[in-house]
């Protein structure tokens, strides 16, 4: 089924599923997926997971074709233990598995970490865990990023709060 203005095809619904635009009939170019939903962000670690009580775990996503946009807020009411780099697990889709093609995004807000607060989000190809990156010194312009570790988690109530968003391509 096609949709036209005057004599020009603007959109087509393919028999096998998906939409094409502006006269394109190739299935490979069809937009074949559009969805939105929720996901549950959870603090984890690359070496051993900390013991965490989450007070806020909100995650939303929109997926159009292979493009995914996620947003989230995660906050703890208690945290202890664990080891290694602190990550946020539970992404709804893994980024495309292309070597050296990382997804990254800003952190809109972070608070109540013990020493350094995370400033950037980083996701490795084909991974569903978001790394929390901070500057490597107290200089806010220091470009050398270092992962937040489980030792940065505060055990205070309403602590370790992160609000962020991330866009990436998935398979």
What does each model-identified segment do?
Residues 1-33, 47, 80-82, 98, ...:
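Trimeric beta-solenoid/beta-helix "fiber body" segments of extracellular/virion adhesins
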Residues 5, 82-94, 139-167:
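Extended Gly/Ser/Thr-rich low-complexity repeat segments
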Residues 13, 63, 123-125:
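Generic beta-strand structural signal
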Residues 18-23, 165-171:
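Enriched but not universal
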Residues 21-65:
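Terminal (often C-terminal
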Residues 54-118, 163-170:
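Beta-rich globular "head" domains
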Residues 113-154:
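Structured beta-strand segments within beta-sheet-rich domains
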């Amino acid at each position: 089924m096609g949709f036209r203005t005057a004599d020009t095809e603007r959109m087509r619904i393919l028999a096998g599923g998906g939409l094409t635009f502006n006269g394109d009939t190739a299935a490979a170019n069809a937009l074949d997926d559009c969805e939105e939903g929720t996901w549950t962000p959870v603090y984890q670690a690359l070496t051993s997971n900390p013991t965490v009580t989450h007070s806020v775990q909100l995650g939303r996503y929109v997926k159009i074709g292979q493009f995914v946009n996620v947003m989230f807020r995660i906050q703890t009411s208690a945290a202890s233990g664990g080891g290694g780099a602190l990550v946020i697990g539970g992404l709804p889709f893994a980024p495309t598995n292309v070597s050296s093609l990382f997804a990254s995004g800003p952190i809109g807000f972070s608070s109540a970490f013990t020493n350094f607060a995370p400033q950037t989000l980083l996701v490795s190809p084909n991974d569903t865990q978001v790394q929390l990156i901070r500057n490597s010194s107290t200089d806010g312009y220091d470009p050398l990023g270092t992962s937040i570790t489980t030792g940065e988690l505060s055990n205070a109530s309403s602590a370790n709060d992160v609000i962020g968003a991330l866009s990436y391509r998935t398979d």
